Amino acid sequence: MAIKPAYVKKTGTLLMDRYPKAFGDDFEHNKELVDELTNIESKSVRNRIAGYVTRKQRSPQQPA
């Protein structure tokens, strides 16, 4: 598993912070949301961000 670039993490985290209830653990749904909420034209970058968000949503929340 590769380490995600900083721009993917930053954009994904920003979207999850701004729209906490919008994203879920379904990649296809998250992909459509990333497409609607950003102006990213590259399909591969959109999919990377959606994949990062999906992975974060699926991971169990660990207490701080």
From Swiss-Prot:
UniProtKB keywords: Ribonucleoprotein, Ribosomal protein
PROSITE patterns the UniProt entry points to: RIBOSOMAL_S17E
Domain of life of the source: Archaea
One GO molecular-function entry: structural constituent of ribosome
GO process annotations (BP): translation
Protein name stated in the entry: Small ribosomal subunit protein eS17
HAMAP family: Ribosomal_eS17 (MF_00511)
InterPro entries in the record: Ribosomal_eS17, Ribosomal_eS17_CS, Ribosomal_eS17_sf
Segments passing through the bilayer: none
Keyword Ribonucleoprotein: yes
Family of the protein in this entry: Belongs to the eukaryotic ribosomal protein eS17 family.
A Pfam short name: Ribosomal_S17e
Annotated source species: Natronomonas pharaonis (strain ATCC 35678 / DSM 2160 / CIP 103997 / JCM 8858 / NBRC 14720 / NCIMB 2260 / Gabara) (Halobacterium pharaonis)
Keyword Ribosomal protein found: yes
Cellular component per GO, a single term: ribosome
